[in-house]
Amino acid sequence: MQFSTVASIAAIAAVASAASNITTATVTEESTTLVTITSCEDHVCSETVSPALVSTATVTVNDVITQYTTWCPLPTTEAPKNTTSPAPTEKPTEKPTEKPTQQGSSTQTVTSYTGAAVKALPAAGALLAGAAALLL
């Protein structure tokens, strides 16, 4: 009888310590910078400068610290360019053809994932210890 009481107390302590081994810290600091975006089409490349949101995530797994930094371009809008040209002196003989252009999407997605195993493994060990204690 005393052994099962001691085992139950050990299982409760294991559950409590498993919960305390999980540490989550969040630090938020908004920062923007300028990034150069290179776009290539038909063997011709062009560069544009865009403001971007900087995001840094630090992940520690088995005492190995890895830092991930991402730069997400922010959508910008440009005012329409005003161009004027002199009136033609002669009527053109051919009608100019127009080629429609496609606009790219300016939506950025940032996702974050915390491995479930990091949170579940200590609790699973404590659960097994508790189940073993109840069987004794």
From Swiss-Prot:
GO terms for cellular component: extracellular region; fungal-type cell wall; side of membrane. It is a lipid-anchor; GPI-anchor. The keyword Lipoprotein applies. The GPI-anchor is attached to the protein in the endoplasmic reticulum and serves to target the protein to the cell surface. There, the glucosamine-inositol phospholipid moiety is cleaved off and the GPI-modified mannoprotein is covalently attached via its lipidless GPI glycan remnant to the 1,6-beta-glucan of the outer cell wall layer. Residues 116-136 form a propeptide. Glycans are attached at N21, N82. Residues 1-18 form the signal peptide. Its main location: secreted. Keywords: Cell wall, Glycoprotein, GPI-anchor, Lipoprotein, Membrane, Secreted, Signal. It comes from the Eukaryota. Residues 73-110 are annotated as: Disordered. It is found in: Secreted, Cell wall; Membrane. Residues 99-110 have a biased composition (Low complexity). A lipid is attached at G115 (GPI-anchor amidated glycine). It holds the Pfam family Flocculin_t3. InterPro entries: Flocculin_t3_rpt (IPR025928). Cell wall protein necessary for cell wall integrity. Belongs to the PGA59 family. This is Putative covalently bound cell wall protein 22. It comes from Saccharomyces cerevisiae (strain ATCC 204508 / S288c).
